Amino acid sequence: MARRNRRLSSASVYRYYLKRISMNIGTTGHVNGLSIAGNPEIMRAIARLSEQETYNWVTDYAPSHLAKEVVKQISGKYNIPGAYQGLLMAFAEKVLANYILDYKGEPLVEIHHNFLWELMQRQSGAGLGVTSGFIYTFVRKDGKPVTVDMSKVLTEIEDALFKLVKK
């Protein structure tokens, strides 16, 4: 099962904070290079902005990691190759953002259908053959073919995410 309590080290958070400070100084420096160097108020504003950006990054990290862990687990269960796992991770993150974190974008059914359409566009590559729009045949590591209904996989990802956050 995916771990809910994935934590970042304080060193990671500090590195990210310093990165944001340097990026914000660089951006502001292109506009007003001389006024930054002598004005402590601008430096405080940059520090506050960087702190806010770091907080947003930290709060978005855990749900994103949770979505990726759920997809890895379900992909392993169905022997889905890595070429398709990236799309499934994007799907899980979108479901998480729109329905669990309440960003409220497109409806869940629409997200589901859009990702099925996107999967249909990627028929070449890792799949051996496609018997229907949503049914894929993949080759396992031992060489045996496995048939997977991608609509069922997407539904299982949705259910696992909703179960993990108890919504």
UniProtKB/Swiss-Prot annotation:
One of its GO terms (molecular function) is DNA binding. Its main location: virion. It comes from Sulfolobus islandicus filamentous virus (isolate Iceland/Hveragerdi). The keyword rRNA-binding does not apply. It is found in: Virion. The gene is SIFV0035. Self-assembles to form a helical, filamentous nucleocapsid mesuring 1980 nm in length and 24 nm in width. Together with capsid protein 1, wraps arounds the DNA and maintains it in an A-form. Capsid proteins probably maintain the DNA in A-form by non-specific desolvation and specific coordination of the DNA phosphate groups by positively charged residues. This certainly protects the viral DNA under conditions such as the extreme desiccation of its host. The keyword DNA-binding applies. The N-terminus projects into a DNA groove. GO terms for cellular component: helical viral capsid. This is Major capsid protein 2. Keywords: DNA-binding, Virion. Heterodimer composed of major capsid protein 1 and major capsid protein 2.
